[in-house]
Amino acid sequence: MELDLISYELDEKTKEGIEKVVEKFFTKAEPDLVLIFDKAGRILACKGMDISDTYSEFISSILSALFFASEELTSMLDKNDEMKDVFYETKNRVFLMARLEKDFLIGVISRKNLSLGSIRLFFNHLVSDLNAVLKNLKEVEKKSLKISKEELKKKLDQILGS
């Protein structure tokens, strides 16, 4: 079994760039939550609802799964089609997800306090601006850790006290 380890380095300049772009989006769209995360659900940035790290990671993992399931469905229907973003709405909220540079994803959850057209327009600008910031993100050599399932189970049992 190989464990995927983080393959990017988030420097201060990039962090500040992300924060600035997200703050600009917040003043326009007033969303409930903005999450920027990698494809494994690890969070780069989180702004909005006052939620625990565990809960935000849980949300980002679900959003990641939704995005990639939608991407797979798109590919099954037409190999030449390309996933742009995922948009869906509930009675009270709007959910938007898109792929960013360097295999990052963004998820936005918003109450329906703006027109859907405005939310989508602001979201498209957000994605474009974040891509400009993330384009310069330093990638580091990806390391993989090989470990047997038995050894992993043993380590987890030690950590969890089982």
Curated annotation (Swiss-Prot):
Coiled coil stretches, renumbered: 129-161
Keyword Coiled coil attached: yes
InterPro entries hit by this protein: LAMTOR2-like (IPR037587), Roadblock/LAMTOR2_dom (IPR004942)
Keywords: Coiled coil
GO annotation, biological process: cellular response to amino acid stimulus; positive regulation of TOR signaling
Parts of the chain that traverse the membrane: none
Pfam family of the protein (one): Robl_LC7
UniProt GO MF annotations: guanyl-nucleotide exchange factor activity; molecular adaptor activity
Superkingdom of the source species: Bacteria
The protein, known as: Uncharacterized protein aq_1822
Organism in which the protein naturally occurs: Aquifex aeolicus (strain VF5)
